[in-house]
């Protein structure tokens, strides 16, 4: 705990593990099972409950509550975990719940993520690296969010939904189906509105790869033949495309929800 400073009004329970150069501000409460990495900063009135691990160089702002019990009626009170990666920014009023003992027992957040005011992560979610949640964005239990995803303000994601890497969810959208990698979803209920071209360029994808994915997505959702056949056709036609391979892999993994499709994409695809 070399260099660590704890405000006299803060409550750090016996057994809590604090790294070096940690800053704990006024009226914070840290549980006995918490593990706080080096150079973390808790500004004031931060509550860290249960077995919560906060990665190095993360900053948590006022009235955030991390590691509370899951909002899951099947949870029986067993020991579960919230694991947050390094260099995350967690703004005012953010809530993240531990996993539930009826499921994986873990809620996992990756490195270099940003969670703006009042964002919410429910039990048993897995959030990747470099993810951004805008104000009041929220995901229900068991949701998987890939790397570099951006979720707009006030957007909500249904339980068990998968969000592919580099996807974008527009503000005040309600996503109830799996969103393919690089996809953009907007509206209530959210529909696939195209590709996250800006995100693809940031990921270093070449122009031809972006064009390939555009054509591949059109093939996937044209309803000219059974969905599995369309997936195989796309995989065969665009076998050299990195982005198309990502989408095909995502689809073949198969989640518990149907897919987020274009507005005129016909019936639900599972």
From Swiss-Prot:
Gene Ontology CC annotation, any one: cytoplasm
HAMAP family: LpxA
Top-rank lineage group of the source organism: Bacteria
Described purpose of this protein according to its UniProt entry: Involved in the biosynthesis of lipid A, a phosphorylated glycolipid that anchors the lipopolysaccharide to the outer membrane of the cell.
Lineage: Bacteria, Pseudomonadati, Pseudomonadota, Alphaproteobacteria, Hyphomicrobiales
Keywords: Acyltransferase, Cytoplasm, Lipid A biosynthesis, Lipid biosynthesis, Lipid metabolism, Repeat, Transferase
Range of residues in the leader sequence: none
Reactions the enzyme catalyzes: a (3R)-hydroxyacyl-[ACP] + UDP-N-acetyl-alpha-D-glucosamine = a UDP-3-O-[(3R)-3-hydroxyacyl]-N-acetyl-alpha-D-glucosamine + holo-[ACP]
Entry's family note: Belongs to the transferase hexapeptide repeat family. LpxA subfamily.
GO function terms (MF aspect): acyl-[acyl-carrier-protein]-UDP-N-acetylglucosamine O-acyltransferase activity
One GO BP: lipid A biosynthetic process
UniProt xrefs under PANTHER family: ACYL-[ACYL-CARRIER-PROTEIN]--UDP-N-ACETYLGLUCOSAMINE O-ACYLTRANSFERASE, ACYL-[ACYL-CARRIER-PROTEIN]--UDP-N-ACETYLGLUCOSAMINE O-ACYLTRANSFERASE, MITOCHONDRIAL-RELATED
Chief location category: cytoplasm
Pathway: Glycolipid biosynthesis; lipid IV(A) biosynthesis; lipid IV(A) from (3R)-3-hydroxytetradecanoyl-[acyl-carrier-protein] and UDP-N-acetyl-alpha-D-glucosamine: step 1/6
Compartments (UniProt record): Cytoplasm
InterPro entries: Acetyltransf_C, Acetyltransf_C_sf, Hexapep, Lipid_A_LpxA, Trimer_LpxA-like_sf
SUPFAM superfamilies: Trimeric LpxA-like enzymes
Organism whose genome encodes this protein: Bartonella tribocorum (strain CIP 105476 / IBS 506)
First-level EC class: transferase
Protein name: Acyl-[acyl-carrier-protein]--UDP-N-acetylglucosamine O-acyltransferase
UniProt EC number: 2.3.1.129
Quaternary structure note: Homotrimer.
Annotated gene: lpxA
Pfam families xref list: Acetyltransf_11, Hexapep
